[in-house]
């Protein structure tokens, strides 16, 4: 079974690249982040035509997550993290597909640091930690996949000294990620590549992709029920080299056959609207996360302010 995560950085503008990747790599499950489209703007027709069922939580211009499943319709179990009823940002979606419980997340970026966006990042991370522990306690085969916006160690970035004031490298961000692993989750990519500098994101700024000046911020974490079934993990770098590419490349894992439990997912892959949402609430106080503009401040080379 192949499970992937891919920050598309705008699903409408990257749709050709997404469809090419789905056809060529054929993941059984794909988690998408930064859709940057309202629910009605999600290209479900094209996704269905590619052979995938989908659930999505959109948001106009910002955020947005989706779970795609090959040949089946994923069964939603949660939309949004518990713990803050006022937070309406579309950052977390959870569903069962092919016998595996998938948590798809887009963790807040947190820049500029320090400030309210970083405070929101840490608060969101704490809620995520609590929910992750509850998932572990169930003993289910769970994968938490997405853009974590955390560079776990200095080995996960081309040159940490230029990013010391970025939210992705702050001690609080790294500590939260370390506490997540301490719960019992396995960082799949690092498990398969313990000593390799392997990246998942290359900024558009200053030719970072041609120079391979990357960061590892997209992660797939495995519950103990799946950790022993990990066969391989890697990054589809070729996608980052396509015209009009996202600044992220897809990251994937391969699990041994029989890794998942019997799934209740239906084999229809029918075109459908996203699952019903709660009535609209007042705008969340949390600051919006903008990641389209990547140019750093002059005083801090390489720093993303979004």
Protein language model regions, located:
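N-terminal, active-site-proximal structural segment of metallo-dependent hydrolase catalytic domains
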Residues: 1-49, 63-65, 261-272, 276-306
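Active-site-proximal beta-strand elements of phosphoester/diester hydrolases
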Residues: 1-10, 99-114, 145
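Active-site beta-strand/loop signature of hydrolases that rely on acidic residues for catalysis
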Residues: 3-7, 22-40, 102, 131-154, ...
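Soluble or luminal CAZymes and related metallo-dependent hydrolases
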Residues: 10, 14, 87, 120-127, ...
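Active-site environment of divalent metal-dependent phosphoester hydrolases
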Residues: 11-13, 37-40, 113, 151-152, ...
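Metal-dependent phosphoester-hydrolase catalytic domains
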Residues: 24, 39-41, 77-84, 153-271, ...
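Surface-exposed cleft-lining segments at the edges of enzyme active sites
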Residues: 82-83, 108-125, 161-166
């Amino acid at each position: 079974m192949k499970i992937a995560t891919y920050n598309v950085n705008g699903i409408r503008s990257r749709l050709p690249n997404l469809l090419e990747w789905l056809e060529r790599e054929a993941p059984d499950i794909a988690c998408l982040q930064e859709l940057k489209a309202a629910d009605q703007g999600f290209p479900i027709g094209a996704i269905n035509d590619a052979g995938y069922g989908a659930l999505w939580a959109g948001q106009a211009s910002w955020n947005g997550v989706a779970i795609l499943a090959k040949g089946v319709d994923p069964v939603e179990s949660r939309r949004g993290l518990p713990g803050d009823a006022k937070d309406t940002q579309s950052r977390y979606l959870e569903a069962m597909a092919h016998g595996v419980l998938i948590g798809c997340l887009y963790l807040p970026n947190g820049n500029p640091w320090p400030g309210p966006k970083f405070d929101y990042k840490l608060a969101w991370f704490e809620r995520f930690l609590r929910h992750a522990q509850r998932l572990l306690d169930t003993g289910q085969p769970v994968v938490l996949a997405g853009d974590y916006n955390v560079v776990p160690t200095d080995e996960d970035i081309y040159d940490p000294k230029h990013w010391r004031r970025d939210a992705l490298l702050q001690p609080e961000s790294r500590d939260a990620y370390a506490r997540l692993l301490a719960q019992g989750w396995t960082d799949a990519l690092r498990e398969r590549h313990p000593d390799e500098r392997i990246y998942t994101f290359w900024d558009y700024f200053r030719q970072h992709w041609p120079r391979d000046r990357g960061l590892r911020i997209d992660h797939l974490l495995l519950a103990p029920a799946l950790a022993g079934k990990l066969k391989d993990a890697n990054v589809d770098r070729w996608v980052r080299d396509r015209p009009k590419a996202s600044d992220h490349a897809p990251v994937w894992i391969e699990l041994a056959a029989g890794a998942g439990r019997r799934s209740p997912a239906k084999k229809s892959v029918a075109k459908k609207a996203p699952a019903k949402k709660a009535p609209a609430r007042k705008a969340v106080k949390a600051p919006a996360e903008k990641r389209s503009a990547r140019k750093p401040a002059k005083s801090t080379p390489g720093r993303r302010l979004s």
